[in-house]
């Protein structure tokens, strides 16, 4: 009787073991299979992150005496950064840039394109999507060169079209230029995501709303937006993080003129590389990572609260 009970008790354990090892590899061989991926993650993600955190606690510089004898300064770099008016100016400019070119610009423009093209014939829609996607897939360095040629004060295409020779758009309106530039570059992602989301909206619901007398705006507000709410949140989160971390505007304005386009990524680069303060730049990078985490957690909290 006792042996029967023992055998019965052991059966579930063996079943659980088989369920946990469906491939029959065993823990050692399974670990060997994932070892290359874990090694790559450790080398290119984990180690640089830990090294950056360490550098942020030191006075490491690229040149000078501190380059040969690095001191441990603890949170000194962080305190110096938080007391630096240039940091807060850069952060305010970054928030404005993200709000105008990302949250509002790319999201609204992407949704408008997706909404307006949903009834267009197949070939025309494919052509429009290809044109919009071209701005997204072309490398940022190439796009920046094209925009510099467009806005050049001497022989620029825009000045030629508007008959305004000598107009220095990059100097007179630098923030507006990088906002429009970022909208132009990133709208394709929002358009594709919203196009996919709109295709999932049941046509019967829109038809019922139309027959009930709902206007186009009412259909959008009461039927479409509640249905694609999750896609809207995902798009806004992705666009916010990408725009917050983008470095491409530097290729247009180099943060100028007079720090007027010095967003956080540019500020970190100027501090760490041309400025030679690698420890301070690492501390800024950690602060930027913390801000990204706060943004992501805030969006996740909003998403859970609306379920």
Question: Where is each model-derived feature located?
Answer:
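Short, Lys/Arg-rich, polar N-terminal cytosolic tail immediately upstream
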Residues: 1-25
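A structural signal for multi-pass alpha-helical bundles of membrane permease subunits
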Residues: 26-307
